[in-house]
Each structure stands twice: as structure tokens, then as C-alpha cells.
Amino acid sequence: MKRVIYVFALLIICETCFSQNKLQDGVYLVDRSAANSIAPGKTNKAIVKFNPFFFEGDPDTYKPLVVFTDDFVPFKLAAAPVIQHQNGSEGQVLVHLTDSAAQKLGEFTAKNRMSEVVVVIDNQAIAVYKVFDPVSSALIKITRCTGSACSLISRQLKNSLKI
């Protein structure tokens, strides 16, 4: 009887884990509308939590974000991510997108001026930016980081994108 209960519990856990949609790594538009809850019938939105390695200040201020999933820019890298170290322990992660991904990012940012976008890596938000001008370069900074966070993101990009 115990085995049946354990098997049943394991099945429920597996069902829960695999039923959650995993977002592709990329740039997504943030939904800041007043009613940004996800309705049961809506499939073009998802909730993204922040990666705790990228908290600056009070972690309670980092609420989950609602993002649109129907129009986004997937990360298609032309080369391995680069960690550029700056003052002290702070650095930034730079990625070189393929030509098609860079073109899509330019169109995406032109269409979504004055809106917020979020960089999602491994189904977690690592940075939120407000779009003022369209991005015109294939080499972009995706986040600032300190400590081991830069290495973590670089490793996740290399592993998930198989570059």
C-alpha cells in the first residue's frame, strides 16, 4: 500500500513539473496593464520570476512579471557569451546574436518603444529594461552582474543554446 501511495505521489509531482511551460531564452515584452493576471483561457502570457542571483537591494521588491509569449526575440547566438569585467567585482554579460536574431530584436524594440522588456534565461528574469530606441547592433549587453552570477548566466546560455 505504501508503494502505491509513493508511486501516486511521484506521478503527481512529475505531472506538476512537466505541465509548466518553459519559456525559450530571449527578450519578452512585459505586461504592465492594470489587469495583468493570467486568465485560464489565455495562452499568450506567462509568469516569470526573477533569478535570485540578480537581486539588487530588497528581494521583496522583485515581484513575478507577466510577459507576452506570442511575440518575443529568442536568443540565437553567433558566438559564446562574453563576460566583461568592470570596476571591482561588477561585470556585464554580452551576447553576439545571429543576423536574423539581431534583425528581429531591432524590429521588436522599434515596435515596443517606451515599453518594458525582460531578459529571460532558464525560465527566470535576469534584467528588465525600458526601450527608448530600437536596438541596431548584434552585440548586446543582457545584464550587469556581480560575483558568480556572470559565470552562472554564461554557463546557462552555453548549455541551453548548445553553441
Listing of model-derived features with the role each one plays in the protein:
Residues 1-22:
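Bacterial Sec-dependent N-terminal signal peptides
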Residues 18-163:
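Structural signature of multi-pass, alpha-helical inner-membrane proteins
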